[in-house]
């Protein structure tokens, strides 16, 4: 009897868990698009309205804005991971063996393109909070796994590199925003130049 009644309960639990994850993913997608369109200052009320639901429902899936930030950061990180794998696979398919310069260039490009593709979302996930710390730590771990074996203390190097790149990209984006509102200010570098310079600087730091 217990086995007979347990199976339907387990089935309902599994369906509910699946529904919850699906709804959570939908809300996260709505939040991403809203932040992309309106910028990082959107509220949980804004997200609820765009989702056609109430704020209390949103809080069932995300306990607070910091958790939303962390989940969105995790989603962005997964996209960066896929881009890195694809770029390295493309290099290998072309007959190249990615060394330190190619790997670091690919990692920086993935980061810069993430910021450039959606400045609002990028600004949202790097706002000071536990969510930011989680995102940057996750990026550091991701980078460390892609570094060549020749790099000493890869975790330490990755943490330092991420801090350097994050600060540099933030300054670059601020310059973009300033120039957009006041064209008389110095024009910012384009994304390709940013990637090239950051790669060069980090490579010099790796081999002083």
Spell out what each predicted region is.
Residues 93-98, 177-189:
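Intrinsically disordered, low-complexity terminal tails and inter-domain linkers enriched
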Residues 1-41, 45-49, 67-70:
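Basic, helix-initiating cap at the start of DNA-binding domains
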Residues 126-170, 189-196, 200-203:
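Amphipathic alpha-helical packing segments from all-alpha helical-bundle domains
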Residues 22, 35, 66-79, 83, ...:
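Alpha-helical DNA-contacting segments of helix-turn-helix folds
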Residues 52-62:
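Short hydrophobic/aromatic patch on the recognition helix
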């Amino acid at each position: 009897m217990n086995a007979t009644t347990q199976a339907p309960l387990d089935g309902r639990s599994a369906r509910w868990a699946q529904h919850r994850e699906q709804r959570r993913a939908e809300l996260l997608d709505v939040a991403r698009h809203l932040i992309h369109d309106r910028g990082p200052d959107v509220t949980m009320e804004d997200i609820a309205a765009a989702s056609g639901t109430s704020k209390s429902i949103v809080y069932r899936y995300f306990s607070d804005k910091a958790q939303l930030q962390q989940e969105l950061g995790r989603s962005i990180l997964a996209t960066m991971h896929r881009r890195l794998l694809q770029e390295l696979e493309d290099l290998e398919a072309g007959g190249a063996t990615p060394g330190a310069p190619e790997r670091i260039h690919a990692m920086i490009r993935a980061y810069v393109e993430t910021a450039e593709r959606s400045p609002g979302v990028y600004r949202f996930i790097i706002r000071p909070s536990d969510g930011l710390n989680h995102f940057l730590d996750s990026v550091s771990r991701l980078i460390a796994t892609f570094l060549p074996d020749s790099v000493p203390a890869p975790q330490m190097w990755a943490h330092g590199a991420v801090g350097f790149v994050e600060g540099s990209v933030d300054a670059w984006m601020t310059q973009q925003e300033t120039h957009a509102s006041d064209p008389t200010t110095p024009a910012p570098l384009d994304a390709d130049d940013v990637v090239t310079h950051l790669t060069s600087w980090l490579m010099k730091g790796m081999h002083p």
